[in-house]
Amino acid sequence: MAGVALKQEITFTGPTVIGGTLVPAGDYKVTHQMQGTEHVMIFKQIGGKAEAKAKCNLVPLTEKARTTEQRYNENAKNEHVLVEMTFRGDTSKHVLEP
């Protein structure tokens, strides 16, 4: 997977929905894997048991990302839903499937 790091860390300041799974606030290890032809992001809570998976699409950036950023939407239950991630130094952003 050229242009993206296979492992990252991310902190959620509040409960967050990832791929349909609600996880609590905390620090997470994020692993990018290929399952067949699909890209999958796996989130595992550091020091906890929470885990979530989401399919993602890689969207090329015009240059290396200068910062790490996340983009969220809000669902009908007013929960934060992670929809996109960009990690500093990567040349693609991760767009998560709901």
Predicted ranges, named:
Residues 11, 32-33:
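Solvent-exposed, non-transmembrane regions of integral membrane proteins
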Residues 24-25, 52, 93:
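A sequence-level detector of short linear motifs
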Residues 38, 42-87:
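Mid-chain, structured segments of secreted extracytoplasmic proteins
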Residues 89-97:
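Short, low-complexity, Pro/Ser/Thr/Gly-rich segments in the mature regions of secreted, periplasmic
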